[in-house]
Amino acid sequence: MTEQIKVSEVSSILRQQLEGIHTSIKLEEVGTVLQVSDGVARIYGLDNAEANELLQFDNGMEAIVMNLEEDNVGAVLLGPTDQIKEGDTVKRTGRIASIDVSEGMIGRVIDPLGNPIDGKGEILGETCEMPLERKAPGVIFRQPVNEPLQTGIKAVDAMIPIGRGQRELIIGDRQTGKTSIAIDTIINQRSNYEAGNPVYCIYVAIGQKGSTVAALVNTLQEKGAMDYTIVVSATASDPAAMQYFHPFAGAAIGEYFRDSGRHALVVYDDLSKQAVAYREVSLILRRPSGREAYPGDIFYLHSRLLERAAKIINQPEVAREMNDLPESMRDKVKGGGSLTALPIIETQAGDVSAYIPTNVISITDGQIFLETDLFNQGTRPAINVGISVSRVGGNAQIKAMKKVAGTLKIDQAQYRELEAFSKFSSDMDPITALTIDKGRKNGQLLIQPQYSPMPVEQQIAILYCGTHGLLHDVPLDKVQDFERSFIESLQLNHQEDVLDILKTGVIDDNVIKAIEETAAMVAKQYL
């Protein structure tokens, strides 16, 4: 006779069995690709997707949500379009598009997603997740620009000074030396790095040829600048979406250094290509177009990017309350850091009144305008002093430079005007002739070879000679010879009593006397 199981025993057995089962439910919102073309996918089923959220396809490729429509979302692909097809499944990640930043990135070449592309292996070190899109620091978390960022270029440091935390536009036609100014500025930070107070540089190459970027990285390595530089590259062959998000990756890396109390410089080369990439993506997403077929928010694209450059208040307790601060950075925040931006814009036939140039001019704190005519005449850097300006950099200029070069910008502008009139007149009064002679010689002093930044103390000494008429007896074609001999003489005889004092920003009577005596001695050979 079989043993019968009582009802009460059945319930206790079932209870024991159920207690041994552990289940975890994980919900994933999954959508389906309706259509894919030209780097953009339309996806159905992701009703709760957020703007700028990262999506993931079955094959591991990622996309970023840009359009939120009634029954589908438009996402830009961060990879080749041919790897995605209609009907593929895609899931939400719940993460806003971001880049993992670490100290190991210094000296490396990476793509906009933070992946190394220089063949030197994985990037090591503790990482911080920095969002690509982030609100700029509010006014309460900033302090005025009051610390100089020396470019090593005489014409810039004397007449259009740049301060840490400033946004200074470099604008001009193609092949006028825009990138050269930015690269010289990066190379000039070598002295800060050696002094133990580095300015970390991020060079963002947007839509350039891979060979051009490789040559540039090679130059930075030869000059020892890769020790404190990160190169972020999205080449012309990369999808438009990568070129569009590319500058935001550079800004996020710069913010990592800025928020941790250090100084950073980011070069966007160039934002014209980003604007074209954004126009392409927007038109494919069927957003309404405006002037020159750019979308209506093209101004906001550049303003929200460039406003992230700032000098942060030197109070850590206030800086920690900064808006939109990533959680991964909260315990690393220190005050007093800065992020300086040098955006580059390419003009067509010198037209600064076009849509994108006028937008970026109105966003930035000044512009360095380069002219093709000056470049072809041999004036390099080919800076048009008349319409180049630095609105806040004057407060950051060191006192000795301000004292020596205070009138240089006006003098050179007047010289350009008088020189134009002198072509129509056969006879000139002595004062006009003297002004033109001085202007020409100062123009020769401001010419500088590429990749040869000059320390600020040497700049002050040689510019004193130009602004105070000490080149009167030097022939025009010998001005650059005079400059070399003068600097060599100062280094040999007056390193401590002149150059070391000028480095501190002080210029006194003893320094002036030594400069004038050295200039007179060197000028004798030209009499």
For the regions a protein language model found, what residue spans apply to each?
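Nucleotide-state-sensitive switch-loop elements of NTP-binding domains
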Residues: 199, 209-253, 284-295, 302-307, ...
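Walker A/P-loop NTP-binding active-site region of P-loop NTPases
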Residues: 164-215, 270
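Phosphate-interacting basic helix/loop segments used at nucleotide- and nucleic-acid interfaces
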Residues: 13-24, 151-156, 250, 305, ...
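Loop/turn-to-beta-strand initiation segments
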Residues: 198-200, 227-230, 261-265, 336-341
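P-loop NTPase nucleotide-binding/switch module
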Residues: 88-90, 97, 101-104, 117-167, ...
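Phosphate-binding/switch loop-helix module in NTP-utilizing enzymes
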Residues: 242-278, 330-331
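Acidic-enriched and Gly/Ser
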Residues: 2-17, 23-26, 32-149
